[in-house]
């Protein structure tokens, strides 16, 4: 388990102290894939580097596996870091060493024998799909393969935690998906806790169990990925989700809807469904029961961690009392109802 307690980080700047992190509190259970997302400058990389104390926090505590790293001696901290692997956006491979020897480097530095190194490295290369490339040099393999070398190297010391700092941001979409699939498989097969930093909500959607949204050094939202997608509360979260799933109507369509409502009454709603609600006739049942007009303006169905997720933008019309009853009925069926605007 990872616990970040009242974590703050300040750096000196030209105009005074800059607060990169402010009173961050997070608990990440063992075996979870936990995402941290935010815009550029939100403090994501600073936060992940406090977990292994590459950046020592100004205030607060970092507890990994029951040990408070901020209280350890230099020697004890070096030993604790062996249980925390890390991969980066840039692969940081040694060009003069083969794939095998790059993965073996941490074990060589730890004084392992050649036999122990081979016994550890060969299964790792098989795990990341690089057994056939073990004798090649970094210049002879692709970017995605280089990141796989970085992952295998990070796993060489058999860590319990893997930190990923924008590890896929320099890769094309197809390669990104393959790396994320690999990380999920490593999490599942090795029981590894993974903390993943990204600015892409698509990455969070594909691989993470839970997510924290960071803005200006503060955690502004946290929860299960499916819950955050269903009902985002903070404007930063809504903007990030909007990069993956359209949350609002295009301006031209919104203007036409407003024109249509000028002479009447109406509700512009966002309805979010998950699980079995996606393929149930809830909307048609609502229309029949409450004698409403529902005009579907926009919709899509996606999948988050194997769970179906649907989102609709609808224009609802009818008697005000019945509209209210209909919205209550939808909520009883597990539909998340958000009123985007009300025009009278």
From Swiss-Prot:
Residues reported to bind ATP: 38-45
UniProt keyword list: Amino-acid transport, ATP-binding, Cell inner membrane, Cell membrane, Membrane, Nucleotide-binding, Translocase, Transport
Homology family: Belongs to the ABC transporter superfamily. Methionine importer (TC 3.A.1.24) family.
Pfam families: ABC_tran, NIL
Protein name: Methionine import ATP-binding protein MetN 1
GO cellular component: plasma membrane
General function of this protein: Part of the ABC transporter complex MetNIQ involved in methionine import. Responsible for energy coupling to the transport system.
E.C. code: 7.4.2.11
Principal location listed in the UniProt entry: membrane
Subcellular location: Cell inner membrane
GO molecular-function terms, A-Z: ABC-type D-methionine transporter activity; ATP binding; ATP hydrolysis activity
Record text on subunit structure and interactions: The complex is composed of two ATP-binding proteins (MetN), two transmembrane proteins (MetI) and a solute-binding protein (MetQ).
PROSITE patterns with a match to the protein in the record: ABC_TRANSPORTER_1, ABC_TRANSPORTER_2, METN
Family annotation (InterPro entries): AAA+_ATPase, ABC_transporter-like_ATP-bd, ABC_transporter-like_CS, ACT-like_dom_sf, MetN_ABC, MetN_ABC_transporter-like, NIL_domain, P-loop_NTPase
Bilayer topology: Peripheral membrane protein
